[in-house]
Swiss-Prot record:
PANTHER family: DNA-BINDING PROTEIN HU (PTHR33175), INTEGRATION HOST FACTOR SUBUNIT ALPHA (PTHR33175:SF2). This is Integration host factor subunit alpha. The keyword Protease does not apply. GO terms for molecular function: DNA binding; structural constituent of chromatin. Transmembrane segments: none annotated. CDD domains: IHF_A (cd13835). The keyword Transcription regulation applies. Residues 59-80 are annotated as: Disordered. Belongs to the bacterial histone-like protein family. It holds the Pfam family Bac_DNA_binding.
């Protein structure tokens, strides 16, 4: 193990996104919260319908149907069926990948326009 200490990564929450809209765009706090909530509700609803969601410069969310398959109980070795299910996948855009690859300085919010 190295002696380099890395900062604990932060988690950006919906409440913090609303606060950022309040600070940067000038919306009141209620409007900012409503916009963030509506944004994520629309994404959730589209995915629930089986639609894809494409956010230019960010990435694509898609729903995939996974077929049933045999699995194995790791304790007993017994074969058990794993049911079919739907999963959400995310593929980052090239733009997002290139920003994430260079974590030394946060991106300038003005350059995202």
């Amino acid at each position: 193990m190295g002696t380099t200490m890395l900062a604990e990564p932060r988690t950006l929450t919906k409440a913090e996104l609303a606060e950022l809209l309040f600070e940067r765009v000038g919306l009141n706090k209620r409007e900012a919260k409503d916009i963030v909530d509506t944004f994520f509700e629309e994404i959730r609803d589209a995915l629930a319908r089986g639609d894809s969601v494409k956010l230019s410069g960010f990435g694509n969310f898609q729903v995939r149907d996974k077929p049933p398959r045999p699995g194995r109980n790791p304790k007993t070795g017994e074969t058990i069926p794993i049911a079919a299910r739907r999963v959400v996948t995310f593929h980052a855009s090239q733009k997002l990948k290139s920003v994430v690859e260079q974590p030394s300085s946060p991106p300038d919010p003005a350059s995202a326009e």
